[in-house]
Amino acid sequence: MYGSEVFRKLIDSFPKLRVVTGILMSKLYLEGDELSVTARKLPGEGYYDNYNAAMQLDSSEKISLHRKSKLVLGVEKLPFIQYLPWMKNLAINLGGSSGGYGTQKVPSVFFNSQEEKGIAPIICYESIYGEYMNQYALQGASLYAIITNDGWWANTPGYHQHLAYARLRAVEARRDLVRSANTGISAIINKKGEIISHTEWWEQAVLKGNVQHNDELTFYVRYGDYLGRIAAFIAPLLLLLTLVRKLNKTQQRLNLKK
C-alpha cells in the first residue's frame, strides 16, 4: 500500500494521517522456534500460524500490528485443539482461514511519530469484552477504533446488539469510538455512548466527523468488574443465610407443635 500513488498523495496532503485496517496474515516458524498450539504444518517441512489482525499505516512507513486476541469459538478457535486435532474439520468457515487462529496475549496500541495519541485497534468480537478493552486504555489508547465484519449475522438483531456493545464500551472508558463495519453498521460514537453518525446496514458509504482523544482513566478502567466479583462472592453467602433462616423457622414450628 505504501507504493500506491493515491496513498502517497494522501500522506503528502495529510502528514498526520493514520490508516487502520484489517488484514489476514501468517507467521512462518523458523527451525528451533517454539510452536503454538494453533501452529499448522506446511505441506513440506515447517510450520506456520494464521492471524486475524489489524494494522496501521502512516507517514513513517512503519507498519504497526495487532493480532486478534479474543477469538470466536467454533470459527476462529476450537477448544482443546492440541488434544483433539480432528476437530479442525468441524470448524465453521465464514471466509478466509478457519479452525484455529493464533493470538497475542496483550493487545497492541497504535502510536506514530507525528502524534503521541494512541489508537486502540479492536477487532470484531473483542469489543464485547469490557475488561479486555480496558487494557487498551491502560496502555495509552485515547481513542477506540473497531473494525468488524458482521455479515455472518445476516439481517438479524445480532448486528444491532454488536453495535450496542460498542456504545457500552465507549461509556465505560469515556472514549470516543469509531466503528468500521465491513458488512454491518459503521458509526461514530462519542464518549457518552451517543451515536453521532452512522450508516445503514450493509450500506457502502463514508462517514466524516470529529472525534476527541481522552487520556483520563475511569473507575471501571482502573478496577474492572469489581461489582460483579463482589456480587459473585455475596450471592452464595446470601443463599446460605436464606437456607439457614428457613431451617430455623421450620425447626421452631416443629418445637411449637410439641
Locations of regions flagged by a protein language model:
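Enzyme catalytic cores with a strong preference for nitrogen-chemistry domains
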Residues: 1-258
